[in-house]
C-alpha cells in the first residue's frame, strides 16, 4: 500500500539485509486516514507538507506552484510566525517532477533529515526543519503502490 523509504544500501554495516520501511508516519505522529487520503488525491507535479511540530502541528501545506516561500513575513506563502524563523527563511521550488528546498540565507538554517542544507532535493518522508517547526514532505507516490 505504501512505498518503502529508500535505504542507504542493500546491506547494513554488519552485513544483514537492509529493511524497507513503509511511510506510515510523519515523524512525531502516525499518518491519519485523512492524511493518507489527501496524499492519494494529490495532482501530478504537486506535493504536500504536513506539520508535525510547532504551533501549526497537524497543518497541511500544498506545494502546487513552481515556487513556494516560507518565513515569518506576512507575504510568505507559508507563514510560520515564530522568532526561530527568519522573515524570508526558505523556498520550495519545483524542478522538473521533483521539489528542492533552498535556504534563503536564514539565521537558524534549514534542515532536511536533521542535516543543515543550503538546498536539497526532497523525497517522500523527508523531514524539513525550519526554526522549531517540522514539516514532512509527501508526493502521491508515498501512498500509491
Show which residues each predicted segment covers.
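Intrinsically disordered, low-complexity acidic Ser/Thr-rich regulatory segments
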Residues: 1-80, 143-145
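Residue-level signal for short segments within beta-strands and strand-turn junctions
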Residues: 51-53, 94, 139
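Forkhead-associated
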Residues: 57-134
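Short, Lys/Arg- and Gly-enriched loop/turn segments at beta-strand edges
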Residues: 135-143
Amino acid at each position: 500500500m505504501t512505498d518503502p523509504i529508500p535505504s542507504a544500501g542493500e546491506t547494513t554495516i554488519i552485513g544483514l539485509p537492509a529493511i524497507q520501511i513503509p511511510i506510515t508516519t510523519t515523524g512525531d505522529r502516525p499518518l491519519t486516514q485523512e492524511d493518507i487520503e489527501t496524499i492519494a488525491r494529490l495532482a501530478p507535479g504537486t506535493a504536500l507538507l504536513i506539520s508535525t511540530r510547532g504551533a501549526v502541528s497537524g497543518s497541511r501545506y500544498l506545494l502546487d506552484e513552481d515556487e513556494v516561500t516560507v518565513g515569518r513575513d506576512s507575504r510568505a506563502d507559508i507563514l510560520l510566525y515564530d522568532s526561530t524563523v527568519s522573515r524570508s527563511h526558505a523556498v520550495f521550488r519545483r524542478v522538473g517532477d521533483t521539489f528542492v528546498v533552498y535556504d534563503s540565507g536564514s539565521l537558524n538554517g534549514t534542515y532536511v533529515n536533521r542535516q543543515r542544507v543550503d538546498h536539497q532535493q526532497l523525497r517522500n518522508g523527508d523531514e524539513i526543519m525550519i526554526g522549531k517547526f517540522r514539516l514532512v514532505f509527501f508526493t502521491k507516490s508515498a501512498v500509491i503502490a
